[in-house]
């Protein structure tokens, strides 16, 4: 699973997921998967979508993951009373804003890329769209 090697602080406040994305252009590949909806992706969801894509393109082409789960989510154990401090870190998430590029693919045809992204979208909890690199 994806998670930071080390962080300055173990736990983080909840915060809010507002605004639009900074990474809204394709930088590495020819095709991309862009988020339309706001949400958060766990490291398991990111890895599951990556596996689905890499299986569908059958070791041809290259995949880039453009999101990284750097926010820890804590959870208290079952049947524990409130209070006594914040719970332990349960999993890591990446906050997603509309317009963010999640994955990129290169060195495959457009039909294969569309099919791979369709499989990946089924694993993700947010709505996404297929985008091409703009060549000027």
Curated annotation (Swiss-Prot):
The keyword tRNA-binding applies. Keywords: Ribonucleoprotein, Ribosomal protein, RNA-binding, rRNA-binding, tRNA-binding. GO terms for biological process: translation. PROSITE patterns: RIBOSOMAL_L16_1, RIBOSOMAL_L16_2. Pfam families: Ribosomal_L16 (PF00252). Disulfide bonds: none annotated. One of its GO terms (cellular component) is cytosolic large ribosomal subunit. One of its GO terms (molecular function) is rRNA binding. Binds 23S rRNA and is also seen to make contacts with the A and possibly P site tRNAs. Belongs to the universal ribosomal protein uL16 family. Part of the 50S ribosomal subunit. This is Large ribosomal subunit protein uL16. It comes from Wigglesworthia glossinidia brevipalpis. The gene is rplP.
